[in-house]
Amino acid sequence: MLIVLSPAKSLDYKTPFKVKAPTLPEFVSESAKLITDLKKLAPQDVAKLMGLSDQLAALNVGRYRDWSKKFTEENSKPAIYAFDGDVYDGFDVKTLKPKAVEFAQDHIRILSGLYGVLKPLDLMQPYRLEMGTSFKNARGKDLYAFWGNRVTDSLKKALDKQKNPVLLNLASEEYFKVLQPKELDCPVISPVFQDAKDGKYKIISFYAKRARGLMARYVVENRITDPVDLKGFSLDDYKYYAAESKIDKPVFRRVERK
């Protein structure tokens, strides 16, 4: 089983980490092409393109300027430790045992606008470039055109090494769109997380994002390779709801929080 996650906008480059053997991203040369184009943008261009404040735009112009093809532990951090949003709050890598992190390296891929796809321990320099950004480049009008089949091909290679080739989609729609699922030639499972509110079950973005991270954690902690075992997921009081589930869209529900 291979999990795909979305990245996070929030980054943490301050908290220390211990990783014996960090790895390098697969598509550094492709990232460098994007950086070359991003370096041409003025802060006001970045602000307009990405809908950022002047302060955040200036921060990211600096990041593009400082980005280097050489990844070191001084300018980079393993992706799974660097991302700091709701998904990664749920995953909580800092409390995982080394063996679980090792399993994650083989069974998780993080989709990225700048890096294409990252393994958890791939060194990553800080950036902001969401996959849905309409950033014109030599290959087309946006990042989906830029990455083409590259990310899909990378995942296909990783899936071919899996004992049970199944893609567990814990990414957002924006990021999953970079893939061509049919070309993966394997089942794709996209769990749905619903919370009760005002007497109805619905997807609440903040909770759903965190639940994706929790499920990724559940998989790596329990070394799950068979999708049937996902039904046992019960972290943070979520429970499998068979009546609403489909094979490719298992539904997990949680009663209203008080």
Curated annotation (Swiss-Prot):
It holds the Pfam family H2O2_YaaD. One of its GO terms (biological process) is response to hydroperoxide. InterPro entries: YaaA (IPR005583). One of its GO terms (cellular component) is cytosol. Belongs to the UPF0246 family. This is UPF0246 protein Pnec_1068. It comes from Polynucleobacter necessarius subsp. necessarius (strain STIR1). The lineage of its organism: Bacteria, Pseudomonadati, Pseudomonadota, Betaproteobacteria, Burkholderiales.
